[in-house]
Amino acid sequence: MKAIIVLLMVVTSNADRICTGITSSNSPHVVKTATQGEVNVTGVIPLTTTPTKSHFANLKGTKTRGKLCPKCLNCTDLDVALGRPKCMGTIPSAKASILHEVKPVTSGCFPIMHDRTKIRQLPNLLRGYEHIRLSTHNVINAETAPGGPYKVGTSGSCPNVTNGNGFFATMAWAVPKNDNNKTATNPLTVEVPYICTEGEDQITVWGFHSDNEAQMVKLYGDSKPQKFTSSANGVTTHYVSQIGGFPNQAEDGGLPQSGRIVVDYMVQKSGKTGTITYQRGILLPQKVWCASGRSKVIKGSLPLIGERDCLHEKYGGLNKSKPYYTGEHAKAIGNCPIWVKTPLKLANGTKYRPPAKLLKERGFFGAIAGFLEGGWEGMIAGWHGYTSHGAHGVAVAADLKSTQEAINKITKNLNSLSELEVKNLQRLSGAMDELHNEILELDEKVDDLRADTISSQIELAVLLSNEGIINSEDEHLLALERKLKKMLGPSAVDIGNGCFETKHKCNQTCLDRIAAGTFNAGEFSLPTFDSLNITAASLNDDGLDNHTILLYYSTAASSLAVTLMIAIFIVYMVSRDNVSCSICL
């Protein structure tokens, strides 16, 4: 008879593990967020730069005005604005102008009292217009003005092109023509008509002359202080002349003068008439400036060398490389970065994670259980992706679609910040346009406060953008997990935390196909589990029946068991000194 001995052999298979993950980096950067404070990320986009000082330049794509009249040699801008005889020329059109004469300058003609009027602003006012031209004819007939007849006074200090006596083209020095009208007079009024083309601003220059008592009597027949008033567009200005007390002064090599002139201007809007009320010594308006358009004005220096994106009062000409800058805040024109108080960086990657580690612990029958933490090294083609662990080692593959979605979100945030930049620039530009007539009197504290407010708005926008970029990682990983689960199907078991245990091997090729979305579980063979192997052992039949065989086996086994028990008992008793054993030969 044959006896059957059953031998069991089970073949097991080590499954691979696939997980979704995020790239790691060996050089983390730090960005600021709204609620998480400083966060380490794998990459950043610097949004700020700190400029260095450079020379001033022309603005790219824009006509930039340095001197009002570049062809008027040896002339200050004030000479040009007043119409000094040897400083008559064309002022080129420009959308940007450099205020290069910071300190009040002399006229280079007759001594002017700068401290009593805003005359030093006249060149700056003209710079604020894109198009400027001097009228071809006079706005008033000075000889027949009220209080006349007058003769137009000239001075050897104001030589004309033939080196004869002259005077400013914008004003007529109204001196009584004969002794009969060299007398004191009550205030007289003259209307100043609008003679420019419709839509242009008319800048009308006027003034008055005063001297010591002797000269006042000689010229005007009255040594008392004279009263003057101008009015245009609801703005009225009053003056009372000063008699005497002036030292002799020569301008630009001219003759010494004991008298002074006070010069002012008024801006007449399209179609509006102005008025001037005066007594003796009036400088009546003659040629007027007709101006239109806006030219942005900034303090700077000449010459203008080359071209730049931006002109900055502190740094000169700049090329814009970043949307914002840190350093000294000052006015700037052109395509300029916006000033912010601190450096800003936009997250351009994922939240930093150290390289992933596989933490292992022993389970039943030595089975290895593990879980992953950190980010994956080697994910060079993207930020999000997959990793597998198994006999092949570690394989990593990036998911390009998920990474592109993350990049698109960052680009959207960057564009939003750019839109915020444009809005703030428009706001600043509007404020500057409203105040361009008073550019030298702008309150720096107000300007700094406005800059601080805008800086805070921008910083908050960057913090919120970084917050959104970092928080969106969970969305991308969840989407990857759903995508992975769908592709693996029944060939894997979801073990949580974005990981799946597969019923097949998944090497680099397998993982690359998962990342590319072309994975097919059927292409990777499932491991086979061998069924129970049963081997039958045949025993020779020597005439012994089964009962006899079993009797022999049981007797031998029982005898062996009893013998072992006795031997163990004797050894135990000897060790306890309860039994002694003597051996004699």
Curated annotation (Swiss-Prot):
Glycosylation-annotated residues: 40, 74, 160, 181, 319, 348, 507, 533, 546
UniProt protein name: Hemagglutinin
Keyword Iron: no
Record PTM: Palmitoylated. In natural infection, inactive HA is matured into HA1 and HA2 outside the cell by one or more trypsin-like, arginine-specific endoprotease secreted by the bronchial epithelial cells. One identified protease that may be involved in this process is secreted in lungs by club cells.
Keywords per UniProt: Disulfide bond, Fusion of virus membrane with host endosomal membrane, Fusion of virus membrane with host membrane, Glycoprotein, Hemagglutinin, Host cell membrane, Host membrane, Host-virus interaction, Lipoprotein, Membrane, Palmitate, Signal, Transmembrane, Transmembrane helix, Viral attachment to host cell, Viral envelope protein, Viral penetration into host cytoplasm, Virion, Virus endocytosis by host, Virus entry into host cell
Positions bearing the site annotation: Cleavage: 362-363
Disulfide bonds: 19-499, 75-87, 109-158, 506-510
HAMAP family: INFV_HEMA (MF_04072)
Organism this protein belongs to: Influenza B virus (strain B/Beijing/1/1987)
Family of this protein: Belongs to the influenza viruses hemagglutinin family.
UniProt membrane topology term: Single-pass type I membrane protein
Annotated GO CC locations: host cell plasma membrane; membrane; viral envelope; virion membrane
Cell location: Virion membrane; Host apical cell membrane
Membrane-spanning segments: 554-574
Coiled coil segments of this chain: none
Biological classification of the source: Viruses, Riboviria, Orthornavirae, Negarnaviricota, Polyploviricotina
InterPro entries: Capsid_hemagglutn, Hemagglutn_HA1_a/b_dom_sf, Hemagglutn_influenz_A/B, Hemagglutn_influenz_B
Subunit structure: Homotrimer of disulfide-linked HA1-HA2.
Signal sequence segment: 1-15
Example of a GO biological process term: virion attachment to host cell
UniProt GO molecular function: host cell surface receptor binding
Stretches in topological domain Cytoplasmic: 575-585
Note: Major glycoprotein, comprises over 80% of the envelope proteins present in virus particle. The extent of infection into host organism is determined by HA. Influenza viruses bud from the apical surface of polarized epithelial cells (e.g. bronchial epithelial cells) into lumen of lungs and are therefore usually pneumotropic. The reason is that HA is cleaved by tryptase clara which is restricted to lungs. However, HAs of H5 and H7 pantropic avian viruses subtypes can be cleaved by furin and subtilisin-type enzymes, allowing the virus to grow in other organs than lungs.
Covalently attached lipid (S-palmitoyl cysteine), positions: 581, 584
Extracellular side: 16-553
Gene transcribed to yield this protein: HA
Major localization class: virion
Main function: Binds to sialic acid-containing receptors on the cell surface, bringing about the attachment of the virus particle to the cell. Plays a major role in the determination of host range restriction and virulence. Class I viral fusion protein. Responsible for penetration of the virus into the cell cytoplasm by mediating the fusion of the membrane of the endocytosed virus particle with the endosomal membrane. Low pH in endosomes induce an irreversible conformational change in HA2, releasing the fusion hydrophobic peptide. Several trimers are required to form a competent fusion pore.
